[in-house]
Amino acid sequence: MNIHEYQAKALLHEFGVPISKGVPVLRPEDSDAAAKALGGPVWVVKSQIHAGGRGKGKFKEASAGDKGGVRLAKSIDEVNAFAKQMLGATLVTVQTGPDGKQVNRLYIEDGSDIDKEFYLSLLVDRETSKVAFVVSTEGGVNIEDVAHSTPEKIITFSVDPATGVMPHHGRAVAKALKLSGDLAKQAEKLTIQLYTAFVAKDMAMLEINPLVVTKQGQLRVLDAKVSFDSNALFKHPEVVALRDETEEDAKEIEASKYDLNYVALDGTIGCMVNGAGLAMATMDIIKLYGMEPANFLDVGGGASKEKVAAAFKIITADPNVKGILVNIFGGIMKCDVIAEGVVAAVKEVGLKVPLVVRLEGTNVDLGKKIISESGLNVLPADNLDDAAQKIVKAVKGG
């Protein structure tokens, strides 16, 4: 689960992390009071969407102006003008795709007098089962670009959760950022604060880009991106309360209600599969035969008829889907349950695109019988390769 920048900063501030003062704004008419409360003389007006690259992004609407999603204002009138332009407009960045995202919230923040910019992030290293720190003196830019062009400027080290963060980890961060004296001490303190917040809130990633040194000699978090481990959210109702469903894919929200593992993609062939490994293999073979999957969807091992029907409805709700491939290897999941769910869903929502079904495993004969006797126009497949070729051919009109 992701949250907005202003929410991430407020959360980090609870752990003592230094941030600039700011006020979230949801309506243009609230920007004046927010700017006056901060005082100025310089303000930063930031679009709040769940995507990076906001500063270099562009709004679709001409009425939003030709500046990006992060704007510097030097007067309260300019703050108000930016708020009117940006709220409700659609911001397109390198991470939103061409459709962009509507800006429903702004964060008006005190401007910072910046001397240096750094990059600092924490994430779960699944290979070592430790918390990894990623540090670079190249802040304020895309870290992927740094990794590609000058990888030697990125330094990583890990913290063992069994022992927790230690003073030497803070010194390692200070050294990586080439800080000394009081700034080194600030970096050491910040390292402990960030790690404590990361663990306490069960974060999956905490990215600060940039972490800045002000001309007054203070370390400050200028931008923060936080994502949480969804499996741990039950422990953190205060985090769940921060969820902004308008930033999420509507189909993914619906899937979560049925405990379905669904991820929307950009292709045209919808997939319903049981098991994450088989789902990925199904996506791979669709691509092998020249087309792209429209989604990742794992219905799990113990899905009911109702759950399968819900999954099918979610797939058909995607206007980009031009064909559907159901690929089930029944172990715990029974093929007849899948068949009943598919038939029920198709009869309710109709079938306007080709459907290929490959069933194998527990109750496979009964499952095939249910589908064949349903009267539906379903293409049966004998194996995964056969299924992929049939759905690709059907979608292409062959």
UniProtKB/Swiss-Prot annotation:
What's one Pfam family the UniProt record gives for this protein?
A: ATP-grasp_2
The protein's required cofactors? Mg(2+)
Catalysed reaction(s) here are: succinate + ATP + CoA = succinyl-CoA + ADP + phosphate; GTP + succinate + CoA = succinyl-CoA + GDP + phosphate
Q: What are its GO biological-process terms?
A: succinyl-CoA metabolic process; tricarboxylic acid cycle
Q: In which pathway does it act?
A: Carbohydrate metabolism; tricarboxylic acid cycle; succinate from succinyl-CoA (ligase route): step 1/1
Family in the record:
Belongs to the succinate/malate CoA ligase beta subunit family.
User: Key word Transcription present in the record?
Assistant: no
Q: What positions does the entry give for Mg(2+) binding?
A: N209, D223
Q: Which residues form the ATP-grasp domain?
A: 9-254
Q: How does it assemble?
A: Heterotetramer of two alpha and two beta subunits.
Q: Please give an example of a GO cellular component term from this record.
A: cytosol
Q: What is its EC number?
A: 6.2.1.5
Which parts of the sequence bind ATP? K46, G53, R54, G55, E109, S112, E117
Q: So what does this one do?
A: Succinyl-CoA synthetase functions in the citric acid cycle (TCA), coupling the hydrolysis of succinyl-CoA to the synthesis of either ATP or GTP and thus represents the only step of substrate-level phosphorylation in the TCA. The beta subunit provides nucleotide specificity of the enzyme and binds the substrate succinate, while the binding sites for coenzyme A and phosphate are found in the alpha subunit.
Q: Which NCBIfam families match?
A: PRK00696.1, sucCoAbeta
Q: Where does substrate bind?
A: N274, G331, I332, M333
- Keyword Cell membrane attached: no
Top-level taxon of origin: Bacteria
Q: Which UniProt keywords apply?
A: ATP-binding, Ligase, Magnesium, Metal-binding, Nucleotide-binding, Tricarboxylic acid cycle
Q: Cite the GO molecular-function annotations of the record.
A: ATP binding; magnesium ion binding; succinate-CoA ligase (ADP-forming) activity; succinate-CoA ligase (GDP-forming) activity
Q: What detail does the entry give on cofactor binding?
A: Binds 1 Mg(2+) ion per subunit.
- Provide the protein name: Succinate--CoA ligase [ADP-forming] subunit beta
